Amino acid sequence: MKDDPGYCGHWPYRNRPKITWPGGARLAFWVAPNIEFYELDPPKNPQRAAWPHPYPAVPGYSIRDYGNRVGHMRQMKLLDKYGIRGSISLSAALCTHHPEIVALCKERDWEFFTHGIYNTRYTYGMSEAQEREAILDSMDTIERAVGRRPAGYLAPALSHSEVTLDLFAELGGLYTCDLFHDDQPTPVTVRGGQRFASVPYSLELNDTIAFVVNKIEPRRYGQMIKDAFDQLYAEGSESGTVMCIPTHNYQVSCPHRMRAFEEALDYITGHPDVWVTTGREIAEHYLATGYDASLADIAARNALALSSTDAKGA
C-alpha cells in the first residue's frame, strides 16, 4: 500500500493563478444527481457489506426504488424550473433496468458521468485488470445508451483502489469527483501523464451525508447550502470557485425535504455572475484555460520550497 497515491501535492489556496469562468462569472454551480441501482441480493464483498442487515435487503432496496420511481421525477421537475441541467452520477446498470429515466435526462441535455455499474459492487478486492474492465464496461454502457462517452468518474459507493484514477484517465476520462480536497478545479497527476483534473464535489453538501450521517434537518440543510454559496461567491470575486450539490433521488426528493432544497436553488440562481453548468463543462473549461497555469504555479512553488530546504541544510 502506498503512503501517498501522489495525485496531488500541497498547493495552498492563497495566491494561485486566477481562474476565470465564462461571462466573468464568480462561481461555477453544478448539481450532481446520483441516479443509482442497488441490488436486492448483491454478491458479497469480503471488505464491505452492501447492506447493514441480512439479505434480501427489502428496506434498503425499496427506498432506493422509491427514488427511481418517484423521487427522480420530483427532482427533475424542480431542476427544470430553475434551468439547471443535472450532471448524473450514473450507475451504468440503470441503462438496462430503467432506460426510461436515462431517456428523460438525455432529452434535457443532462450530463452523464460514470458511477460504476451497480452501487452494491465495490472496487475493494479487484485486481487492476478487473477494475479496468469494470470501468470500461460502465463507460461503454453509458455511451451506447446516450451517444456520448462519459468524461467524469465517481467510484461506486466511493470505493477505490490505488490505481482508480490512473485507469480512468487511461481510458479517456477527463475528470474525477473522488478527491474532496478543494473548492477549485486542480490538476491530478496520473501515471500515464494525461491531462486530468479534479472537479470539486462536496461531501459536506451531499444529501446522504447530511441527512443520514450527520442527522441534519431539512431546513438546516437548506441554510447550509446558502451559507456555502455565500462564502464561495465572495471568494469567487478574486478567482473562480466551484460549488456542487450532490443529491440522491431517495433523499432530497422526499416530500418533507423538497421545500428547503428549492429555496436554496432559488437563492443561488437568483444571483448574478453564477455559471449554472455541468461537471464536464467545468472540466473542459479548466483544462483549456487554467490547467497549464496551475501546473506551472505548482512547479514554481515546489522549486522554491526545495531551494529553501537546501539553503537551510547548507
PLM features: residue spans?
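Catalytic alpha-helical scaffold of carbohydrate-active enzymes acting on polysaccharides/glycoconjugates
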Residues: 1-152, 157-197, 222-245, 251-314
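Positively charged, amphipathic and often flexible ligand-engagement surfaces
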Residues: 185, 199-220, 240
